[in-house]
Amino acid sequence: MIVRKSMGRVKSLLMLLMVLGFSFATYNLVFMMMEHKAGNDLGSFDGKAMEIRNTNSKYHVAVTATDAAYSQWQCRIMYYWYKKTKDMPGSAMGKFTRILHSGRGDQLMNEIPTFVVDPLPEGLDRGYIVLNRPWAFVQWLEKAVIDEEYILMAEPDHIFVNPLPNLATENEPAGYPFFYIKPAENEKIMRKFYPKENGPVTDVDPIGNSPVIIHKYMLEEIAPTWVNISLRMKDDPETDKAFGWVLEMYAYAVASALHGIKHILRKDFMLQPPWDLDVGKKFIIHFTYGCDYNLKGKLTYGKIGEWRFDKRSYLMGPPPKNLSLPPPGVPESVVRLVKMVNEATANIPNWDSLNRS
């Protein structure tokens, strides 16, 4: 056992052990309940489920983050655009929380509403820092006061480009279908975590945890299982090799399926430049991919372009103000992204100095 000086860390570790113990018990319970599956699905929420309906209920925007400069500058841009779109017609945004899983506060505490939680015990993430995300949500849900009944799980590299309504219902969360999350094509691996007795692997949605809008009670049920499945997947060499950097996304999808939850799949939830060319009526720009073009506006993906925007170019500090716009011929989605970054950096105080490692 790792000895911690902070009693808060000790309590956090004890809570993790309790979560894992509960999750293992929950997972094993699946096998015991298969004979009664028709009326007793694990976590099917039959007692809480209400008539499916569109809702105008507000959702709480929650983004998990670290205190690294790379995470900080993205969070600052995201929060800027949250504030600009929050009260626009059509938006159902409530309050905002940056869930900081570094175990300590940072210099953005007074700028962005922040809730500090502990990281996983040292070494447990095995260098895969995203494993801290489900554990961060477990702690936040357990300890924080959350006024809204729904939660949007978001990421630092999300920019709100249009007012986002509540896309979920009481018993159906809303998620984005990722083309690279393919449960059916990985059935052998999936069966380690989603047994045949549970049903076909197509029950597992092709999603990650973000972006997802979900009712709070559902996330409270899913989150401990999500922690457990994430750690079990990381501990399995075959799964770790096959899923790589999207392992935690698969873990959320499996955890949801184990609880009998299907998501409304919304392709308009998000766009991802440079592959998505137009913004249209989509709601979030996800700038996870590098955008590389020659001066004729031709995409040179996989090769550094004469013009480029890639968030990984700014690992140690923020991008400069007034980035050059893409050359003519570059898709509108990329142009819009750079313009939105430029607007944010021009208006956020102390942009060049506050968030540097």
Swiss-Prot record:
EC no.? Answer: 2.4.2.58
The annotated consequence of gene deletion is: Dramatic increase in root nodule number when inoculated with Sinorhizobium medicae. Inhibition of root growth in both the presence and absence of rhizobia.
Supply the InterPro entries for this chain. Answer: HPAT-like (IPR056508), HPAT/SRGT1-like (IPR044845)
A GO CC term attached to the entry: Golgi membrane
TM helices/strands, residue ranges = 13-33
- Tell where it localizes: Golgi apparatus membrane
Pfam families (alphabetical):
HPAT (PF23452)
Entry keywords, A to Z: Glycosyltransferase, Golgi apparatus, Membrane, Signal-anchor, Transferase, Transmembrane, Transmembrane helix
The UniProt GO MF terms for this protein read:
hydroxyproline O-arabinosyltransferase activity
Catalytic activity as recorded in UniProt: trans-4-hydroxy-L-prolyl-[protein] + UDP-beta-L-arabinofuranose = O-(beta-L-arabinofuranosyl)-trans-4-hydroxy-L-prolyl-[protein] + UDP + H(+)
Membrane-topology descriptor: Single-pass type II membrane protein
Q: Does the keyword Transmembrane apply?
A: yes
Tissue-level expression reads: Expressed in the vasculature of leaves, petioles, stems and roots. Expressed in the vascular cylinder throughout the root, and nodule vasculature.
Outline what the protein does: Probable glycosyltransferase involved in the O-arabinosylation of several proteins including extensins and small signaling peptides. Catalyzes the transfer of the initial L-arabinose to the hydroxyl group of Hyp residues. Probably involved in the arabinosylation of CLE12, a signaling peptide that moves from root to shoot, to interact with SUNN receptor kinase signaling that regulates nodulation. Involved in long distance nodulation signaling events.
UniProt protein name: Hydroxyproline O-arabinosyltransferase RDN1
According to its UniProt entry, this protein's organism is Medicago truncatula
Q: What is the lineage of its organism?
A: Eukaryota, Viridiplantae, Streptophyta, Embryophyta, Tracheophyta
